[in-house]
């Protein structure tokens, strides 16, 4: 009798095939945080919370840590930037300070993934000790689905590779590929002053909450010296959209800025609200908008601007639209000036403003 003819044998064989097939799909999730070398040490604490003793800061105050895997589960993770022990806000007891600091805490913690695995962030990442900025850099992509940050003034999620000057300071990020995906549980960046997403593309399935939110999209060299964004050659095909907002996605922040540089790559934005200051949206392609509200000014520029029917686009002060074609189908309101710079304007929605300053060559009302 064939050994595989028995039902139990066939079942075991299929189970073995299944496990062999699916295991490679989740290496990053299983791996947690794995340092690439001995400069960074990772220890697991009770409650499945990894504590990372970060690498010795360089002369510029940067602790540059490299990993095979950098994933944060729902219990969270801790970056130890303390010179003394204590208890973290996540409830983890740390007996001793991080000896790698040599008495001098880092001013910026860079966590760079050098393998081929994406990063999955599903919990809160805490800086223990001196408050400092945190960067997670993974060219393969980053998924944030319920991630948050504790004791850090600035958070950067990037698919770029960090570039350093001769003094060891962060010079730029070079982005050639990779997407940041915000899952249904969102990104809570409200505890930081600044949240930056620097990637070739971003997908919003959940909400980003922040004080000051900046998205820089496309294949770019992003300077940390003067803030300039210079397009460079990307790897692989262009994304269909630089930013794509799904049904439950959105951005909520005190101030919002978006720059998308790849020619012909569009942006789909909905549920975008600034609670304190302005919103600035700039793209080299088509930008489609629905339910956008700026507490002060709203500035939008692109090759083509389309506002969707059944939605609202609103500025509590001035609203500026600059494109080759502006196609307004929404309820569009400016409590101050409305400025329109376009070759063609189509309006099948409603428009309300205090003053209109239009500069177009052709208009369809």
Language-model segments: residues:
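Solvent-exposed adhesion/ligand-recognition segments of exported proteins
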Residues: 5, 18-275, 282
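Conserved small/polar residues in nucleotide/adenosyl-binding loops
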Residues: 354-361
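Hydrophobic helical h-region of N-terminal Sec-dependent signal peptides
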Residues: 13-17
């Amino acid at each position: 009798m064939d050994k595989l003819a028995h039902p139990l044998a066939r079942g075991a064989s299929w189970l073995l095939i299944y496990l062999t097939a699916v295991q490679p799909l989740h290496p990053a999730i299983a791996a947690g945080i794995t340092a690439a070398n001995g400069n960074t040490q990772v220890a697991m604490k009770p409650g499945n919370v990894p504590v990372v003793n970060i690498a010795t800061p360089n002369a510029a105050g940067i602790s540059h840590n490299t990993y095979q895997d950098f994933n944060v589960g729902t219990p969270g993770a801790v970056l130890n930037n303390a010179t003394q022990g204590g208890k973290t806000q996540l409830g983890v007891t740390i007996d001793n300070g991080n000896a790698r600091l040599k008495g001098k805490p880092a001013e910026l913690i860079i966590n760079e993934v050098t393998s081929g695995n994406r990063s999955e962030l599903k919990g809160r990442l805490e800086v223990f000790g001196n408050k400092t900025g945190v960067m997670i850099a993974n060219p393969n992509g980053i998924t944030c689905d319920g991630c948050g940050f504790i004791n850090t003034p600035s958070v950067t999620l990037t698919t770029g590779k960090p570039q350093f000057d001769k003094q060891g300071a962060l010079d730029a990020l070079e982005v050639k590929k990779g997407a940041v995906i915000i899952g249904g549980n969102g990104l809570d960046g409200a505890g930081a002053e600044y949240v930056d997403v620097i990637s070739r593309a971003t997908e919003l399935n959940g909400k980003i909450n922040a004080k000051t939110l900046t998205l820089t999209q496309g294949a770019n060299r992003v300077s940390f010296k003067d803030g300039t964004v210079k397009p460079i050659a990307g790897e692989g095909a262009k994304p269909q959209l630089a930013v794509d907002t799904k049904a439950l996605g959105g951005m909520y922040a005190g101030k919002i800025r978006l720059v998308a540089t790849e020619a012909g790559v569009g942006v789909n934005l909905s549920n975008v609200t600034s609670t304190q200051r302005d919103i600035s949206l700039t793209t080299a392609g088509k930008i489609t908008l629905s339910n956008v509200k700026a507490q002060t000014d709203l500035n939008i520029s692109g090759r083509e601007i389309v506002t969707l029917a059944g939605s609202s686009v609103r500025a509590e002060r001035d609203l500026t639209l600059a494109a080759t074609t502006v196609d307004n189908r929404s309820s569009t309101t400016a409590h101050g000036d409305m400025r329109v710079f376009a070759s063609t304007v189509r309006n099948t929605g409603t428009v309300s403003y205090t003053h209109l300053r239009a500069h177009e060559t052709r208009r369809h009302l």
